[in-house]
Swiss-Prot record:
Primary subcellular site in the record, as a coarse category: membrane
Organism, as annotated: Homo sapiens
Bilayer disposition of the protein: Single-pass membrane protein
Pfam families: SMIM5_18_22
TM regions (residue ranges): 32-52
Main function: May modulate lipid droplet formation throught interaction with SQLE.
Domain of life (superkingdom): Eukaryota
Record protein name field: Small integral membrane protein 22
Keywords: Endosome, Membrane, Transmembrane, Transmembrane helix
Compartments, as annotated in UniProt: Membrane; Late endosome
Gene Ontology biological process terms in this record: lipid droplet formation; positive regulation of cell migration; regulation of actin cytoskeleton organization; regulation of cell cycle; regulation of cell population proliferation
Length: 83
C-alpha cells in the first residue's frame, strides 16, 4: 500500500493551509468532540495522579498495626437441644 508523492504533498499542503487559516476543525461538532476528549483525558490523568500520590505519600513504611479482634462464636446456639 504505497502512497504517491502527489497525495502526500496534497495532504501536507492541506494541513499547512489549515494551520495558516487557524481553522483546525471542519465543523462545530469536531470542536465539541475534541473538547470532550480533552476533558476525558484530563480526568484520567488527574485520577492517575491522585492514585500515585496516595500510594507514595499515604503509605507508612512499617507494617500495619491492627487491633486484635475479639473472637466471636460462629453459628447460633440451638436452645432446643439443652435439657
Amino acid at each position: 500500500m504505497a502512497v504517491s508523492t502527489e497525495e502526500l504533498e496534497a495532504t501536507v499542503q492541506e494541513v499547512l493551509g489549515r494551520l495558516k487559516s487557524h481553522q483546525f476543525f471542519q465543523s462545530t461538532w469536531d470542536t465539541v468532540a475534541f473538547i470532550v476528549f480533552l476533558t476525558f483525558m484530563g480526568t484520567v490523568l488527574l485520577l492517575l495522579l491522585l492514585v500515585v500520590a496516595h500510594c507514595c505519600c499515604c503509605s507508612s513504611p512499617g507494617p500495619r498495626r491492627e487491633s486484635p479482634r475479639k473472637e466471636r462464636p460462629k453459628g447460633v446456639d440451638n436452645l432446643a437441644l439443652e435439657p
